[in-house]
Amino acid sequence: MTAQIRPALVSDVPHLFRVRISVNENHLSVDQLAQMGITEEAVAGMIAASPCAWVAVVGDQPVGFSMIDMDEASLFAAFVLPTHQGRGLGRKLVLAAEEKLFECHEEIWLETGRETRAAGFYRSLGWGGQQDIGNVDIRLTKRRS
């Protein structure tokens, strides 16, 4: 079944959290996310305020999402259910987020783990300019082409 990429709706928020806590790499629980200020209410408020998230939908089920912080010029999140990884959904979600960010910014950034599959994935999409930000994390950047 083909996936559709569309802007996220407030009603998608519980599904976004289901996807977020399902991942194996960079796993965080709902409680850990809440300690960082990332709650369903906060994410719903962000989505209601401006177009800042996209979902990959298979059938009627969201199976992945990406989210940006436009003010910060950052790709805030990009996650796909483990059962749907390797199908190009992450690439499509990141490209949708990049397109929106590049409407207002010449350079965008994200943070991820240094030795993760995600870091390699982002590099394959043209992200670079690696900067060590401590612990095991790096910041990658991408310029509008």
Task: List where the protein language model places each region.
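Conserved beta-strand in the GNAT
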Residues: 55, 61-69, 74-79
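Conserved GNAT-fold acetyl-CoA-binding loop/helix
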Residues: 17-43
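Residue-level recognition of the GNAT/N-acetyltransferase active site
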Residues: 81-85, 113
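A short beta-loop-alpha structural element at the N-terminal edge
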Residues: 4-18
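Conserved active-site alpha-helix within GNAT-family acetyltransferase domains
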Residues: 91, 114-132
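Conserved acetyl-CoA-binding loop-helix of GNAT-fold acetyltransferases
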Residues: 86-99, 124
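A short helix-loop-beta-strand connector motif used in the catalytic cores of GNAT acetyltransferases and
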Residues: 44-55, 74
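Conserved GNAT acetyl-CoA-binding A-motif
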Residues: 101-113
